[in-house]
Curated annotation (Swiss-Prot):
<comment type="subunit">
    <text>The 26S proteasome consists of a 20S proteasome core and two 19S regulatory subunits. The 20S proteasome core is composed of 28 subunits that are arranged in four stacked rings, resulting in a barrel-shaped structure. The two end rings are each formed by seven alpha subunits, and the two central rings are each formed by seven beta subunits. The catalytic chamber with the active sites is on the inside of the barrel.</text>
</comment>
<protein>
    <recommendedName>
        <fullName>Proteasome subunit beta type-1</fullName>
    </recommendedName>
</protein>
<dbReference type="InterPro" id="IPR016050">
    <property type="entry name" value="Proteasome_bsu_CS"/>
</dbReference>
<keyword id="KW-0539">Nucleus</keyword>
<feature type="propeptide">
    <location>
        <begin position="1"/>
        <end position="20"/>
    </location>
</feature>
<comment type="function">
    <text>Non-catalytic component of the proteasome, a multicatalytic proteinase complex which is characterized by its ability to cleave peptides with Arg, Phe, Tyr, Leu, and Glu adjacent to the leaving group at neutral or slightly basic pH. The proteasome has an ATP-dependent proteolytic activity.</text>
</comment>
<dbReference type="GO" id="GO:0005654">
    <property type="term" value="C:nucleoplasm"/>
</dbReference>
<dbReference type="Pfam" id="PF00227">
    <property type="entry name" value="Proteasome"/>
</dbReference>
<keyword id="KW-0647">Proteasome</keyword>
<dbReference type="InterPro" id="IPR029055">
    <property type="entry name" value="Ntn_hydrolases_N"/>
</dbReference>
<dbReference type="GO" id="GO:0043161">
    <property type="term" value="P:proteasome-mediated ubiquitin-dependent protein catabolic process"/>
</dbReference>
<keyword id="KW-0963">Cytoplasm</keyword>
<dbReference type="GO" id="GO:0000502">
    <property type="term" value="C:proteasome complex"/>
</dbReference>
<dbReference type="GO" id="GO:0005829">
    <property type="term" value="C:cytosol"/>
</dbReference>
<dbReference type="InterPro" id="IPR001353">
    <property type="entry name" value="Proteasome_sua/b"/>
</dbReference>
<dbReference type="GO" id="GO:0019774">
    <property type="term" value="C:proteasome core complex, beta-subunit complex"/>
</dbReference>
<dbReference type="GO" id="GO:0005634">
    <property type="term" value="C:nucleus"/>
</dbReference>
Length: 235
């Protein structure tokens, strides 16, 4: 700027340090589907761990067994996923040592909500879905927003392909906007839930580059957790 015939703030064109914008988050992709039945719960997640167009791993599980009847699916920023799940496991171990019993699925759901809310000013960049068996032996699914608000549901999808997966669940599990009599609705069995979860991931892998390679499916019952694997496209 010129004033009184001379430059007030001359630009000497001196090269200096440049500070690019700092981004504390990284999206590593991944998708999750969970379905609750009368006496079971099914939760599935793909195994692709990526960043942009780079694939870091094709075999990384995003399902974390917290107890014999509770499984957490977590996708998003992998560093935040490891930090959150590690913290939850430590708290569960402390509870078990203090009370000499394993936390129920409902208690884990509440604890996870509190842990996420404690980080509300710098939230975990993850999409969490918790599935398990409740005190009455019924399947339950809990979904969360970034600051820990918890919602109990019959089925839920999350992650990078969540918007592609959820409408399929609404149609096949929830029978939304379908003129069906109760007698015409297909009964939700374990195999039906596994089939729908598998089909949703096969479809999502065609449209979402952050979802693929394979799917790990956990079938949770009062007797334990059964694990199945489904291969997806790997491109």
């Amino acid at each position: 700027m010129s004033r009184l015939g001379f430059e007030q703030f001359p630009d000497y064109q001196v090269p200096g340090m440049k500070h690019p914008d700092f981004s504390p988050y990284e999206s590593n992709g991944g998708s999750i589907v969970a379905i609750a039945g009368d006496d079971f719960a099914v939760i599935a997640a793909d195994t692709r761990l990526s960043s942009g167009y780079n694939i870091h791993s094709r075999t990384q599980s995003k399902l974390f067994k917290l107890s014999p009847q509770t499984v957490l699916g977590s996708a998003g920023c992998w560093a935040d996923t490891l930090s959150l799940t590690g913290s939850i496991k430590v708290r569960m171990q402390s509870y078990e040592h203090t009370h000499l019993r394993t936390m129920t699925t409902e208690a884990v759901a509440q604890m996870l909500s509190i842990a996420m809310y404690n980080r509300r000013f710098f939230p975990y960049y993850v999409s969490n879905i918790l599935a398990g068996i409740d005190n009455e032996g019924k399947g339950v699914v809990y979904s969360y927003d970034p600051i820990g608000h918890c919602e109990k549901a019959t089925y839920r999808a999350g992650g990078t392909a969540g918007t592609l997966l959820q409408p399929v669940l609404d149609n096949q599990i929830g029978h939304k906007n379908m003129n069906l009599e109760d007698a015409d609705k297909i009964k939700l069995t374990k195999e039906r839930a596994v089939s729908v979860a598998s089909d949703t991931f096969i479809s999502a892998a065609e449209r979402d580059i952050y979802t693929g390679d394979s799917v790990l499916i956990n079938i949770i019952t009062k007797d334990g957790i059964e694990v199945r694997t489904l291969t997806l496209r790997q491109d």
